[in-house]
């Protein structure tokens, strides 16, 4: 069975109430004037960078217990729903490959500004990606969460295969659902 944009949206919406922050993180990669094979390689490098940044970010959430997210990820690792955008050939030289990420299960004492500082350090300094990051608390986002999910999956609505291809929009390997933390509410 091939996934559709609706299937992915439905999956994301199961965890909508647990999402506290939405984040856009641009990479250093620009698909302009590159072949599909080159763009796929850039996307794979981007996904590796995101995996590394998410691990660094997760550890920074618990500075006195940085091993929490590796020893007990089902409780302490942040909820992460990720999509990747601009992984197609383009004539727009300004476009970058970037991630749209919904986060949850973050320590409640952290402000949006503090979360941004921690993620920016992990993404820009540690993973050596672009400093172009935008983060907002879901209560401050100008639209409801359902519209955010529609926005981050807009490429799958334009090109159906992006919903189910392994090099498609949904970055499954960088998604994480901390079931024990979610079920303890």
Predicted regions and their residues:
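Right-hand nucleic-acid polymerase module
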Residues: 1-97, 105-185
